[in-house]
């Protein structure tokens, strides 16, 4: 015999075959309903406000956290925009400084080049003047020496001693002029004869 058959047999022997097991007695139903009502009233009176308060606090914390997060995000976005603006400004400033430096560098190079050209021109001018002065001095010295040598030679060749300084100077000038003319290629003729002095 199975267990379910044994239970059915015990139930039928109890003698309460008229009663429905699913419908409780009225007294139990009233007491159960009253207890449930008290439990619901206690829940709405004590527990529900605490739950609502906790729920409100949690909602407030969540919304406050969201608001703080949004504020922090806005602040971060503003800082990012400010950083980008400063970075753009710094790049523009760096480009301007670089361009100014290039311009200044070119100006300095041009100034140095112009200054060097002026110095070169001045040095060349001084050198030319010095060369001209040295040449004039050397030419004068050579003329004197050549004149003395020419007079000595003329005196030895002619056998006549030129005593006068004016005559010596005229003879030297004539001789040097003749040498200059032949050196310049004025002609291929022989130098003019030196005049006899008296």
From Swiss-Prot:
Keywords assigned: ATP synthesis, Cell membrane, CF(0), Hydrogen ion transport, Ion transport, Membrane, Transmembrane, Transmembrane helix, Transport
Q: Which GO terms describe its cellular component?
A: plasma membrane; proton-transporting ATP synthase complex
Question: Which membrane topology describes this protein?
Answer: Single-pass membrane protein
Q: Where are the transmembrane segments?
A: 25-45
The subcellular localization recorded is: Cell membrane
- GO MF entries: proton-transporting ATP synthase activity, rotational mechanism; proton-transporting ATPase activity, rotational mechanism
Instruction: State its role.
Output: F(1)F(0) ATP synthase produces ATP from ADP in the presence of a proton or sodium gradient. F-type ATPases consist of two structural domains, F(1) containing the extramembraneous catalytic core and F(0) containing the membrane proton channel, linked together by a central stalk and a peripheral stalk. During catalysis, ATP synthesis in the catalytic domain of F(1) is coupled via a rotary mechanism of the central stalk subunits to proton translocation. Component of the F(0) channel, it forms part of the peripheral stalk, linking F(1) to F(0).
PANTHER family linked: ATP SYNTHASE SUBUNIT B (PTHR33445:SF1), ATP SYNTHASE SUBUNIT B', CHLOROPLASTIC (PTHR33445)
Q: How does it assemble?
A: F-type ATPases have 2 components, F(1) - the catalytic core - and F(0) - the membrane proton channel. F(1) has five subunits: alpha(3), beta(3), gamma(1), delta(1), epsilon(1). F(0) has three main subunits: a(1), b(2) and c(10-14). The alpha and beta chains form an alternating ring which encloses part of the gamma chain. F(1) is attached to F(0) by a central stalk formed by the gamma and epsilon chains, while a peripheral stalk is formed by the delta and b chains.
Q: Which family does it belong to?
A: Belongs to the ATPase B chain family.
The protein's name is ATP synthase subunit b
Native organism taxonomy: Bacteria, Bacillati, Actinomycetota, Actinomycetes, Frankiales
